[in-house]
A protein has these predicted regions:
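N-terminal periplasmic/intermembrane-space "pro-region" immediately following the signal or transit peptide
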Residues: 1-25, 35-47
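Signature for the C-terminal beta-barrel architecture of outer-membrane proteins
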Residues: 3-9, 16, 27-29, 61, ...
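Surface-exposed loop and membrane-interface regions of Gram-negative outer-membrane beta-barrel proteins
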Residues: 26-28, 42-85, 112
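Residue-level recognition of beta-strand termini and adjacent short loop/turns
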Residues: 43, 209, 341, 372-374
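A mature extracytoplasmic/lumenal domain signature
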Residues: 52-54, 92, 101-103, 146
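Short aromatic-glycine motifs in intrinsically disordered, low-complexity regions
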Residues: 81-93, 233-241, 368
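Hydrophobic alpha-helical hairpins/lids featuring a short glycine-rich hinge
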Residues: 87-90, 96-107, 126
Length: 411
């Protein structure tokens, strides 16, 4: 990378933040939030985004609470929030590392870890990471939800069968077999029961063109050491990619038995590890899950009227998943983001619903607005309905809203 290819950005956001209780319990708090940010882009092989969010209490909160909102920095894992993103190595490199906030992360096939976010707990701010490596026909991805804590970690190894049997082919990864395992250590911001899940997957690409691919998939998984806990899956997926469009679609039929389910480490897992959605009031590792079948559908679309650049330049980002169970339960989560008026206005809305249609359903909503009204100045607003884990394992519902301004050297 030549010096001319290096780019940097500095940013400072200052906003007022209100934390409000919903229902019984909790206290009202007013804070000032200051977020300095430094980004350095070294091209495809290197990038880093550092930030140090600090929230200062103006009013409210627990008795004898200090000026600094201590929940933001009360554990070793919370220091991981300084690393928003760190990239070493490109997607094509034989070895690459990524660290930071995991947002809608899936571990390869996604049948164990799917659309997982490690910072959905508002008082827990870890840095996660994943390492990818390629050696001949073998591709491996290993991940950790918290590089500073004994939390969720696992890996998936994928073998290119055509490469093994007939040598390197023009189209790599056409027929693959993969095995994955994920373990919850249960230690971090609070403790939760340990759990280990494993899965075997096979994929076959049945139609491929320069910008389109159609594949079939099937798999089987279980909970090692627990008899009768297993699940099976079969489905179809499609990927399309052009300079202005990137789309991934998936449709699956699933079977659950003995408490096992695909995608157990999903979008609400950092809350479910303390209390799963539903009437059981137990952690996910111990909560019963009804036997039956389900249909799972997922769409992930990015579009730009000019050209897709990285993950940031998109006039439209749309990601949604829904799973409908024979037990009359529905799980869904999604996010839509828009860039309008020459990208001066950015809007985003996220929705999460778990256990819909059954007692103890869980709902989360979050929205964000960013309006650039001058070359280096912008206004920003955020709001949402977070759930705060308590020492007894319960989840206290809350609401938050913030409004502020920021300055950067992006333009």
């Amino acid at each position: 990378v030549t010096p001319e290819e290096w780019h940097f950005l500095t940013r400072l956001d200052v906003s007022g933040l209100a934390l409000l209780p919903r229902g019984d319990g909790g206290t009202r708090e007013g804070l000032v939030q200051v977020v300095p940010t430094l980004m350095l882009d070294g091209g495809a092989e290197f990038g880093v985004n550092l930030e140090a969010p600090v929230r200062l209490r103006l009013w409210g909160g627990e008795r004898y609470a200090g000026v600094i909102h201590q929940e933001d920095w009360d554990s070793l894992s919370d220091w991981g929030q300084v690393i928003r993103a760190l990239k070493l190595g490109s997607n094509e490199a034989p070895l690459a590392l990524w660290m930071g906030a995991l947002d809608s992360y899936s571990l390869l096939s996604g049948h164990l870890v799917r659309r997982y976010s490690n910072r959905i707990n508002p008082d827990y701010h870890p840095a996660g990471g994943f390492l990818t490596g390629t050696l001949g026909p073998l591709y491996v991805e290993a991940f950790a939800s918290d590089v500073l804590g004994a939390r969720l970690f696992g890996a998936e190894a994928e073998v290119d069968l055509e490469h093994v049997l007939f040598g390197r082919s023009v189209q790599a990864g056409r027929y693959t077999l993969a095995v994955s395992a994920v373990h919850e250590g249960g230690r971090g911001e609070g403790t939760s029961p340990e759990i280990t899940l494993a899965h075997l997957d096979g994929t076959a690409v049945v139609w491929a063109r320069s910008s389109f691919e159609l594949h079939l998939l099937a798999g089987w998984g279980g909970r090692p050491g627990t008899g009768g806990a297993w699940g099976a899956v079969a489905g179809v997926g499609a990927d399309a990619e052009t300079p202005s469009l990137n789309a991934r679609l998936r449709l699956e039929a699933r079977r659950q038995h003995g408490g096992f389910r695909q995608g157990a480490f999903g979008p609400d897992y950092e809350l479910a590890r303390f209390r799963a959605a539903g009437a059981s009031r137990q952690p996910l590792a111990e909560a019963p899950f009804p036997e039956g079948a389900s249909v799972y559908a997922e769409a992930d679309v990015g579009w730009d009227a000019e050209r897709l650049v990285g993950r940031m330049q998109r006039h439209l980002s749309f990601s949604w998943a829904v799973e409908v169970f024979t037990s009359r339960r529905v799980d869904t989560d999604g996010r839509i983001a828009l860039q309008l008026f020459e990208r001066n206005l950015e809007l985003a809305l996220s929705v999460l619903g778990v256990g819909l249609g059954r007692p103890g359903a869980r709902y989360l909503v979050a929205g964000e607005l960013r309006w650039r009204f001058a070359s280096r100045l912008y206004a920003l607003g955020r709001g949402g309905t977070p759930l705060f884990p308590q020492t007894d394992g319960s989840l206290r519902p809350g609401a938050q809203a913030s409004l502020g301004v920021g300055v950067d050297n992006a333009r």
